[in-house]
Amino acid sequence: MKVGFFLLKFPLSSETFVLNQITAFIDMGFEVEILALQKGDTQNTHAAWTKYNLAARTRWLQDEPTGKVAKLRHRASQTLRGIHRKNTWQALNLKRYGAESRNLILSAICGQVATPFRADVFIAHFGPAGVTAAKLRELGVIRGKIATIFHGIDISSREVLNHYTPEYQQLFRRGDLMLPISDLWAGRLQKMGCPREKIAVSRMGVDMTRFSPRPVKAPATPLEIISVARLTEKKGLHVAIEACRQLKEQGVAFRYRILGIGPWERRLRTLIEQYQLEDVVEMPGFKPSHEVKAMLDDADVFLLPSVTGADGDMEGIPVALMEAMAVGIPVVSTLHSGIPELVEADKSGWLVPENDARALAQRLAAFSQLDTDELAPVVKRAREKVEHDFNQQVINRELASLLQAL
């Protein structure tokens, strides 16, 4: 069986879940080809990029120059190159293909692809990729069934939904299978009009062979708190910093490390300075994986207080939480998006309402008083939950079976 992966941009260092799924299908013995519209950063990649020689398996459909005018010239040239083909003309149907017809993306691809890309099934990551894949199949550029994975921003951001809701409704008719990563997103797809029989929840997961549980340890003094996340609004790190201000006022001894980079870095650093928390809150920025692991080993609790962004952007189910639970680090998070599908409140971790710094500070203060006897059953249930419901190897085998039955 041949499996194609259809991506808007590849590779992206932030999308390790895509890379992991691609290599898993290769490891399972499937023939794998990758189609991407745009080329990502091929210099700063994960080891699997080289190990599996993924460049040789990838075809980029929009290898374009930079700059708006240069892009349009290039697309016009590619369109003219294939103007003798029927599908190139069809791709210019504005009523049927919308913005991707107007900006010549589809016609340029049709103009340069003489022989269709074939696979038994194409897995499209993120809703917009599924939309484009379905259009290209209709135009004869790709041949095969299409399964679209919906993650988070593609099904929650108001900007995305304002543009793509009509496109998604077309995808529900044109596509073969919708794969939301949570029950919450499955319900949302149904409300948008997707037939229930075209929906199957397929979670992201973690490779349990990479995570050995550490011994249960009581919280230290000072309490070691850690977050590993991209620095964006929906990660709720501004709420965490406000909670730290309250903890400090209450006299709770702690140290908080925020690992990661992102567009909210300056805002978070300003908040730390404003609250005079430089002595207890650190932002080391990007760290290589071995240093992150060492810091995680030192941590007493993993904190991810996710919130809904001002633009509606939401998490799916954060893999960072799964990894912490798999290795035996207690987690504190929020009642946000699909997180309660992973963390059972007060049983496999602790959840507080979104945007509630006071509740977060209270939870962390209470956590600092727990002993190993109280923590042991929570940590055990957390790993069992990930092992049972978020085990990457099991999930990928189940997905492969589902696709083979399409």
Curated annotation (Swiss-Prot):
Signal sequence bounds: none
Species of provenance: Escherichia coli (strain K12)
NCBIfam families registered for this protein in UniProt: wcaL
Gene Ontology biological-process entries: colanic acid metabolic process; lipopolysaccharide biosynthetic process; slime layer polysaccharide biosynthetic process
Source organism phylogeny: Bacteria, Pseudomonadati, Pseudomonadota, Gammaproteobacteria, Enterobacterales
UniProt KW Ion transport keyword: no
SUPFAM superfamilies linked to this entry: UDP-Glycosyltransferase/glycogen phosphorylase
Swiss-Prot/TrEMBL keywords: Glycosyltransferase, Lipopolysaccharide biosynthesis, Transferase
The keyword Transferase belongs to this UniProt entry's keyword annotation: yes
EC number(s) per entry: 2.4.-.-
Record's protein name: Putative colanic acid biosynthesis glycosyltransferase WcaL
Family: Belongs to the glycosyltransferase group 1 family. Glycosyltransferase 4 subfamily.
